[in-house]
Amino acid sequence: MATVENRPGHATHEVLNQASALEDYNVFESDRVLHAALHREGGGWAEGRAIEVGAFAGSAQAQMWGREANENPPCLRTHDRFGNRIDEVEFHPSWHKLLSVGVGFGLAALPWAEPQPGAHVARAAMFMCFGQAEAGVGCPLSMTYSVVPALRAQPELAAEWEPRFTSAAYDGERLRPAQDKAGALAGMAMTEKQGGSDVRANTTSAVPLNGGGPGGEYAITGHKWFCSAPMCDAFLVLAHAPGGLSCFLLPRFTPDGERNRMHLQRLKDKLGNRSNASSEVEFRGAWAQLVGEEGRGVPTIIEMVNHTRLDCVLGAATGMRVGVAQAINHCSGRATFGKLLVDQPLMQNVLADLAIESEAATIS
């Protein structure tokens, strides 16, 4: 790797011995382990797409967008300047640019939009490449990808919403009814303050409207301590119906075009994943539809959870790969004690250990 050339502008010193930025390279083509895994696991037909994603993710443009999205985190706007409740999250334009590209690549829908052997493998490889540009946008992409199998428990809801969730068009820069948009994104809200992962301890309630039942209407009242990607168009939520803990599809807008009674309380102050908004919410009689049977909420929503957990693993492996790539790039452009760091025996051992751990994470 080339080092940064000396540039004028410092009266006191010269800038020397600094590695160059790792950019304008192909993330996929430079990862022989991921390339081999894609072919070995049945996704080789998508190599061309993976190369395209890899070229974007490694580009200076994508890397800049990623930095900008993290340096300018999302901001919650509960009310407009006239005092009206709006419950919106504002993102830096780079967030929307990245998300638009990710949706266009099919990272939110490929296995459902183009079902064929190896489709999940292909998407996984592309997801890992894309995450090396910016990881936060992976949350709404993952949630949207994961909602489809759970939503299919209620065929009429799937018929209405699946075409929106599998669209290759991103239409999320402005909050408006999903029926007026070219594409939609999905989120999830399960956790409550008192229960955490013990969702059986949830207290949020669902009251049937017009009889309720599978696909029927309910009013949701309660809270969620963690709501993923709150600017999405619809969410799977858990609430206690008369028949027990149940799964519901809760959109940001009601069928008549009014904002649903889903009120964002605050955004989480997180250690990482800062470009992406995670929120606390309250439902005050919010309109929702039952997905599946009453009392079958956990088995229904677990279909979504399982797929998101796959992406959690992919995200961790992606982070490891980024760390290795950045470390090797730095050590290839910085010298110490008369040698490049990459040529120092002790550093070679460290880099080899990191590379082995990254390879193991990728293939497992």
Where are these regions (language model features)?
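Extended amphipathic alpha-helical segments enriched in small hydrophobics
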Residues: 309-364
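Short Gly/Pro-enriched turn/cap motifs at secondary-structure boundaries
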Residues: 194-197, 226-228, 240, 270-277
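Extended, charge-enriched "interface" segments that sit outside catalytic cores
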Residues: 1-116
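Internal maturation/activation junctions in enzymes
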Residues: 157-204, 208-209, 213-216
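A glycine-rich, basic-preceded beta-loop-alpha segment at the flavin cofactor/substrate interface
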Residues: 256-258, 265, 280-308, 325-343
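A short core secondary-structure module
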Residues: 216-261
